[in-house]
Regions:
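Structured surface interface patches that mediate subunit assembly and partner/cofactor docking
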Residues: 2-8, 14-18, 25-38, 55-180
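Short, conserved "active-site rim" segments that organize catalytic pockets and cofactor/ligand binding
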Residues: 49
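Short, surface-exposed acidic-centric catalytic microdomains
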Residues: 52
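Extended, alpha-helix-rich binding/interface surfaces that flank or overlap catalytic cores
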Residues: 45
Length: 180
């Protein structure tokens, strides 16, 4: 059974802290590196993460979001500050609209955890990742990413087989249909 929203408080905060550190620690010379997301380099991945955070903040505030719309350049001159501003907006929206926490937080945890792994892979910082974040995200993904949901979206493939020795992040990536 999926953990309650209160059970996600610590891993969700840890995922956001982790992403803040990953973005802040990414140097300009790393922006053109490939990522596990074949269609994105580090710059495009960070743009997706920051722009996506702004969209999740809008959802948390009760606004409708067009997820199919292209994300404009969200990096700006200071990607870490832009991410922090989005996080502040998200937290404010949760404070003003607690009724949206259950709908938004688990999905954003999954997104933040898997893209944190992507960014860490691309910038050689996988050893810095908190396994508890991946474990909580995987629990949320197992609850939310049902076979019916997989049929309705192209964002996730079928689960990929992995060895029993896989790390929590590799298990999360494989469950989301990605080769770890």
């Amino acid at each position: 059974m999926f953990p309650g929203v209160a059970d996600l408080d610590l891993p969700y905060a840890a995922a956001l802290d982790q992403m803040t550190e990953l973005i802040a620690g990414t140097s300009p010379d790393q922006l053109s590196r490939p990522t596990p997301c074949a269609e994105w380099d580090v710059r495009a991945l960070m743009n997706h993460v920051i722009g996506g955070l702004e969209r999740f903040a809008a959802m948390a505030a009760g606004q409708s979001v067009d997820w199919s719309a292209e994300i404009p350049d969200a990096l700006g001159h200071d990607p870490a500050a832009r991410f922090q501003a989005g996080r502040t907006a998200l937290e404010a929206a949760f404070g003003e609209h607690p009724e949206n926490i259950e709908r938004v937080r688990p999905t954003h945890l999954i997104e933040t955890a898997v893209h944190g792994w992507d960014l860490a892979q691309a910038t050689d910082r996988v050893g810095d990742l908190d396994p508890g974040v991946a474990e909580a995200a995987l629990a949320a993904a197992r609850e939310r990413l049902t076979p019916e949901v997989r049929k309705r979206t192209t964002a996730f493939g079928q689960e990929v087989p992995i060895p029993a020795s896989a790390t929590p992040y590799e298990r999360l990536a494989s469950f989301l249909g990605r080769e770890p």
